[in-house]
Amino acid sequence: MTMANAADRTHTAFLALDYATRIVENYSHDPGVADRAAYALASARKAGAPVFHIVHEAMQDQFHPLLAPLGDEPVLGKRTLGAFATTDLRERLEAVGIRRLILGGVATSGTVLSTTRWAYDIGYEVLVCADACADPDAQVHAALVDESVFPGSWLGLWRIARMVDSNAVTSLLS
């Protein structure tokens, strides 16, 4: 491992966005998203990366069984689409020296898009774990995470974040 990789690993957190049962089961085009998100979460945990769970404040006790917080992983209740505006997430990330974020969540066009843009705007390096994300509309999800779908779009997350898959989380953090 190079020194740069070690620094990336120790300054990286995983943000689990809106993985409440109701959201995962009703607002996802992809029935396999929970399994892949669980794999990505397990990889982050195994590597010792901090995991933050952000969900609407009314759903803080309604996590999908595969995606529930473990131990003392923080759960932040939000009142907006994104993870930053109505939580103390930024302060928590700064307190532990986080500079790089890996995001997964439902819905891609909601919490993932909003959180990615905010994180990018305030200086974080952002990686979107695209197969740990889903949207009610498969075409919208694809347009947001796959440059080849709509290459002229300024909406694509790939313009401001690196797209990865759940299998890559392990190598990114080791």
Residue ranges and their predicted role:
Residues 1-13, 39, 43-47, 58-174:
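Active-site-adjacent betaalpha module
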Residues 16-17, 49-56:
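Short beta-strand segments at enzyme active-site cores
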Residues 21-26:
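Short acidic, Gly/Ser-rich segments with clustered Asp/Glu that frequently serve as metal-coordination loops
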Residues 27-44:
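…and closely analogous acidic/polar surface helices at protein-protein or active-site interfaces
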Residues 30-31, 55, 143:
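A short linear-motif detector with a strong N-terminal bias
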